[in-house]
A protein has these predicted regions:
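Conserved loop-alpha-helix segment in the C-terminal half of the alpha/beta-hydrolase fold
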Residues: 221, 228-271
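Flexible "cap/lid" loop of the alpha/beta hydrolase fold
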Residues: 127-167
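Conserved HGGG/HGGXW glycine-rich cap/lid loop of the alpha/beta-hydrolase fold
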Residues: 19-74, 79
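Catalytic active-site module of serine/aspartate enzymes centered on a nucleophile-bearing elbow/loop
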Residues: 263-292
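Alpha/beta-hydrolase
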Residues: 160-236
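Conserved hydrolase catalytic core segment
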Residues: 100-143
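N-terminal cap/lid segment of alpha/beta-hydrolase-fold proteins
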Residues: 2-19
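Active-site loop/oxyanion-hole signature of alpha/beta-hydrolase fold enzymes
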Residues: 63-109
Length: 292
């Protein structure tokens, strides 16, 4: 079930032959555009906490369910699942909603999309927030292997065997992924309902085509993606945030910070991949100070 905060205005856009569903809080003098992670994941998990903490601070929240997820159209054509096409989709939404220059926040996959967008449409950006993301996928994959190794050599051997045999649904493999998720995706004992709402409606066709079968195995069409060298050309004022225990770890954030010419970095010491749930007070204070 794709739960929607009733305070959002729902806007339907006709994009080529498809429908895109956008959400606009309508309130606030400063607009923040959210790009959620995934890919293929509805925007609930990112939309709801930002609405809760920012609208009463005068910040208008706009986001949308990217093509292939949530209430937007879900075509079966896998050729649609490319980062370049999503860049043009984002630019279409910006134009249709007449948003002008964006304060653009990209979380996880949304960060990869935001980086790619900034390289083509930098003049359409006011500020850029890159959250729990990276600019170099091969480097990330090496870091994920390091996180996997912390489970112990026997567990790593087991995981590699199931990945080679294609038995990723085996209970022992799934148990290892669950441990990694609670260490590096969200460290809360109970995950909020808005996370479950997104996870329960995840379009795995998009996710598996672009990324892979889970958060710790990248075999999709993004596995070689690397924009670190090009990021030196991004001059937009940028905030980079990362959790100390993040699946996209601080080393990824540091590489981006070193590449960008106008960025600052904030590490949340008690967070993994979702500091807006894990350390909301510190996270939203940092975000508000940067936006305003």
């Amino acid at each position: 079930m794709n739960t929607i905060n009733k305070s959002f205005k729902q806007i339907n856009l006709k994009y080529k032959n498809y429908n895109l569903v956008c959400y606009d809080s309508q309130i606030g003098d400063i607009t923040l555009f959210l790009l959620n992670g995934g890919p293929g994941l509805p925007c609930n998990y990112l939309r709801e906490p930002h609405y809760e903490h920012l609208v009463n601070k005068g910040i208008r929240i706009i986001t949308y369910d990217q093509l292939g997820c949530g209430q937007s159209s879900k075509p079966k054509d896998i050729s649609l699942w490319s980062i370049d096409r999503y860049v043009e989709e984002l630019e279409f939404v910006r134009n249709e909603l007449n948003l002008g220059k964006l304060n653009l926040l990209g979380h996880s996959w949304g960060g990869w999309l935001a980086i790619e967008y900034s390289l083509k449409y930098q003049n359409n950006l006011k500020k850029l927030i890159l959250e729990n993301t990276c600019g170099d996928m091969p480097h990330l994959i090496s870091e994920l292997n390091r996180l996997r190794q912390a489970l112990g050599s026997e567990t790593v051997k087991m995981m590699l065997r199931h990945e080679a045999e294609g038995t990723l649904d085996h209970p022992e493999y799934q148990a290892a992924i669950t441990i990694l998720n609670y260490r590096h995706v969200c460290r809360l004992d109970e995950w909020p309902e808005s996370i479950h709402a997104s996870l329960n409606d995840w379009n795995m066709d998009v996710y598996e085509t672009m990324q892979g079968p889970n958060e710790f195995l990248y075999i999709g069409n993004l596995k070689e993606w690397n924009r670190i060298n090009e990021m030196k050309d991004v001059r937009t004022n940028t905030l980079i945030t990362v959790g100390m225990h993040d699946e996209l770890p601080p080393s990824c954030a540091l590489k981006m910070n070193n590449a960008l010419s106008n960025s600052i970095i904030k590490v949340f010491k008690n967070s993994s991949h979702m500091p807006f749930y894990e350390e909301p007070d510190k996270y939203f204070k940092t975000l508000i100070n940067f936006i305003k």
